[in-house]
């Protein structure tokens, strides 16, 4: 059975892990880093993902995508080099990279994964993540909430009963979950969050400040300059990270722009105090969901035993101070906030494959589910923080006499009116027999699976007629679209492979030309001139092919030159061997010369007995 990997598909960085010898292990990427930037770019038709994509973002901002996770489950499209891509396709490219890195590490093909999502992701965002996995060639065995995964990794070896608060502030999303842990039993009591709050927002307040200060000093608005914006983002992110360890940092961006008077440079000091002032409302925004989760769990801050920090943004001192002040407890720092979610996903993969035993995980649905009823009211069928998997049914009736059908409008959210909540989908139940209003009985059933994905069924109890759907949001992808994207991804993977092979062949040919020139200088005068002329002609043929020939022409010319050089080398060795043999024969023919005090060897054995 092939290995199942655990993937933390993050907004700014992603991480992949696997179970090794009963322990979850993070898989480093080829650059040696344990997390990979969630960045995708296209340059001259070539797809670039991860570290390399992030490095070239400054010079290629229009064809580089960052933080695509923020658009999952929406109809957003990215245009790169003239081609349109959905968030699912961009995410699939990141997943393909992680899959490839895992395969290189394990030395075998990987086809199955457990992928994490923010706990507060709605159904369409979860479905989009699952679709991204499918496009990347992965069967997604389970979608796991990020705070739950973190608790899994943290609680693996813990035997004592404890109530933990997982505070997860990542690059683009924020979640807080309350769990009860007890010897392999993980029960989520409540979860809350904000899908539009993360490290990107902390970067943005620094960027806005830099733009504002630069405009005051030079009268130039950098927010209109795409290349300057990318440099500012990188500088803001670096400053934010620096200020977690030092009290002041210098932001230096030479030649950030130019006007009629010449080039302009951005040089500025940023203190931790100023950064905390700029981001104070963001820190305060994390407290709302934290209070909500505690309230839903029916707990007070004093009843929390441990606070676990997850996500790179929890390194910000003001964030740590806020949660410490709220709970009255020093946050636990025994886990790596960048890696713990992927490690937990690997543990869940181990549970599903049977490699990890005696672990029971009970998660919850983050948002209430229901339908629209008369007057545009949102009628809940399943309340938020209900343990999943779960199902619930309720009987409704018609609102008008002789109503021939009903539209079931499925929603997710907490507001009283349907219009204020998130539409997951709509479907119709038709052919209801004529009857006065209130007489027909229509049973609506909701079913949420362990991935948090919703199935809805409507049944006319009078006729037994039934209609059911698995919710795919209006922004979701149809099966046909997913199949097309899977094929495109496979073709792109094949094209990437061919492009890599072509580069390797060109490099090999180039290297062969260099070594041939070196070899021909060394053998000059030692082999026939005709052989050297033949090799030079073949070498020139390779050079010409490299300048403008097809890859087949390069390969053919390279193989021809390689064979000629090998023949020259063989002849050279044969000549050397013959010369050595002749020298040895000559020495044997004069083996008994008379002693005339001439010593032929390096030394002479003297017989002391004489």
UniProtKB/Swiss-Prot annotation:
Entry keyword annotation includes ATP-binding: yes
Pfam families registered for this protein in UniProt: HSP70
Keywords linked to the UniProt accession: ATP-binding, Chaperone, Nucleotide-binding, Phosphoprotein, Stress response
Modified sites of kind Phosphothreonine: 173
Residue ranges of the region described as Disordered: 581-610
A single MF term (Gene Ontology): unfolded protein binding
NCBIfam families associated with the record: PRK00290.1 (NF001413), prok_dnaK (TIGR02350)
Role: Acts as a chaperone.
Protein name: Chaperone protein DnaK
Species annotation: Brevibacillus choshinensis
């Amino acid at each position: 059975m092939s290995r199942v990997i655990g993937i933390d598909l993050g907004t700014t960085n992603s991480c992949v892990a696997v179970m090794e010898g009963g322990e979850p292990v993070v898989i480093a990427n080829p650059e040696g880093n344990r997390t990979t930037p969630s960045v995708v770019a296209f340059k001259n038709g070539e797809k670039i993902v991860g570290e390399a994509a992030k490095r070239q973002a400054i010079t290629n901002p229009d064809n580089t995508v960052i933080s695509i996770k923020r658009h999952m489950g929406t109809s957003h499209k990215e245009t790169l080099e003239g081609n349109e891509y959905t968030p699912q396709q961009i995410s699939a490219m990141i997943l393909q990279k992680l899959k490839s890195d895992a395969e290189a590490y394990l030395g075998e093909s990987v086809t199955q994964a457990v992928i994490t999502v923010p706990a507060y992701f709605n159904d369409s965002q979860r479905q989009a993540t699952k679709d991204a996995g499918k496009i990347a060639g992965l069967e997604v065995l389970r979608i796991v909430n990020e705070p739950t995964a973190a608790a899994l990794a943290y609680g693996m070896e813990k035997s004592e009963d404890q109530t933990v608060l997982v505070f997860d502030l990542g690059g683009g999303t924020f979640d807080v979950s309350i769990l009860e842990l007890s010897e392999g039993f993980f029960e989520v009591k409540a979860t809350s969050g904000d899908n539009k709050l993360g490290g990107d927002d902390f970067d943005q307040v620094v960027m806005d400040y830099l733009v504002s200060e630069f405009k005051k000093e030079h009268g130039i608005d950098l927010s209109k300059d795409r290349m300057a914006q990318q440099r500012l983002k990188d500088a803001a992110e670096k400053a934010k990270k620096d200020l977690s360890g030092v009290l002041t940092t210098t932001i230096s961006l030479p030649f950030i722009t130019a006007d009629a008077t010449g080039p302009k440079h951005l040089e500025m000091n940023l203190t931790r105090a100023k950064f905390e002032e700029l981001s104070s409302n963001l820190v305060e925004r994390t407290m709302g969901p934290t209070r909500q989760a505690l309230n839903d769990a029916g707990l007070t801050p004093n009843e929390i035993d441990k606070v676990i920090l997850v996500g790179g943004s929890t390194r910000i001192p003001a964030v740590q101070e806020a949660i410490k002040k709220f709970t009255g407890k020093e946050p636990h720092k025994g886990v790596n906030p960048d890696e713990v979610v992927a490690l937990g996903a690997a543990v869940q993969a181990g549970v599903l494959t049977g490699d990890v035993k005696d672990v029971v995980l009970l998660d919850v649905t983050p948002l209430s589910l229901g339908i629209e009823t008369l007057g545009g009211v949102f009628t809940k069928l399943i309340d938020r923080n209900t343990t999943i998997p779960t199902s619930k049914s309720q009987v409704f009736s018609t609102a008008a006499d002789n109503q021939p059908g009903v539209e079931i409008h499925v929603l997710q959210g907490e507001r009283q009116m349907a219009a204020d909540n998130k539409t997951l989908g709509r479907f119709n139940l038709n052919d209801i027999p004529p009857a006065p209003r209130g007489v027909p009985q229509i049973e609506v059933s909701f079913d949420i699976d362990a991935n948090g994905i919703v199935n809805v069924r409507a049944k006319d109890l009078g006729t037994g007629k039934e209609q059911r759907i698995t919710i795919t949001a209006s922004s979701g992808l149809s099966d046909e679209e997913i199949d097309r994207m899977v094929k495109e991804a496979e073709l792109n993977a094949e094209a990437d492979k061919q492009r890599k092979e072509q580069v390797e062949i060109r490099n090999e040919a180039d290297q062969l030309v260099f070594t041939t020139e070196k070899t021909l200088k060394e053998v000059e005068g030692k082999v026939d001139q005709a052989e050297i002329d033949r090799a030079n002609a073949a070498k020139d043929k390779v050079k010409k092919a490299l300048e403008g020939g097809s890859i087949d022409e390069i390969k053919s010319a390279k193989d021809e030159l390689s064979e000629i050089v090998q023949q020259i080398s063989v002849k050279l060795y044969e000549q050397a061997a013959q010369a050595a043999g002749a020298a040895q024969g000559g020495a044997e023919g004069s083996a008994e010369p008379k002693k005339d005090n001439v010593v032929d060897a390096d030394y002479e054995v003297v017989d002391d007995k004489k």
